[in-house]
Amino acid sequence: MAAHNLIVQELKKIDQTPIVSEEGNEGDPLSTDTCWLVDPLDGTKEFIKKNGMFTVNIALMRRNKDRWNPIFGVVHAPVTKTTWFGGIVIPSERRGPDGTGLMMVNPSMPPNPVRLVASGTHRGEKDELFAQKLGNYDLVRMGSSLKACIVAEGSADLYPRFGPTSCWDIAAAHAVVSGAGGIVVDPSGKNLDYDVIENILNPYFLVAADNRWTEDWVKLQ
């Protein structure tokens, strides 16, 4: 709750844009066409395990009728002191002790293996089926929205998510991926959008460095 309070305090210094957070709302998002979407701790299991794979997620959302799209996002990993940020009008960037610079997706080309990133705690039958369709692949396990961020920075190609998530779990990283030239699609292959008011749960989604794998993704649904 302390992280939530600090984030809300700092966002309010910018303007009075409503804030939707996993820990509680500030203002009415339906009163305007934009809102902040906040997850003060993404990766609770990783936080408990003390493996460092948890993040703070903040997204600026724009409303389109009853759906919302992320236009800017910030993902911060406190343990590594690394921040990923960007969106549809701001090229994505990574800043941290290992260096600073603009990011761009870097999809693998045959005969190189597809670089697949998956959750360290959630893996089921559909994950296995999708991996089998890829054929030649390398798998990295990771927690929180870091999985999407390494796609954005060019270190992975695909992050399929078949498990349950909420809007604040991925929206910030979605913006970062978009700003790096990648895509985040729903089960039909369309750009993932969000409901931040009522049904906060996301459908399954795929984060990808490009659209080569979208057809296989849609067929699996």
Language-model regions: role of each:
Residues 102-128, 133-142:
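Short loop->beta-strand "edge-of-pocket" segments that line small-molecule binding or catalytic clefts
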Residues 1-42, 75, 129-132, 190, ...:
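N-terminal subdomain of lithium-sensitive/metallo-dependent phosphomonoesterases centered on the IMPase/IPPase/PAP
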Residues 11, 44, 77, 86, ...:
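Residue-level signal for inorganic ion chemistry
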Residues 22, 119, 142, 185-187:
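Conserved beta-strand termini and adjacent loop/short-helix elements that scaffold enzyme active sites
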Residues 128-133, 147-221:
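Oxyanion/phosphate-interacting regions
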Residues 65-67, 91-94, 99-101, 212-217:
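Short helix-loop capping/hinge motifs at secondary-structure junctions, enriched
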Residues 30-93:
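DPxDG-like acidic metal-binding loop motif
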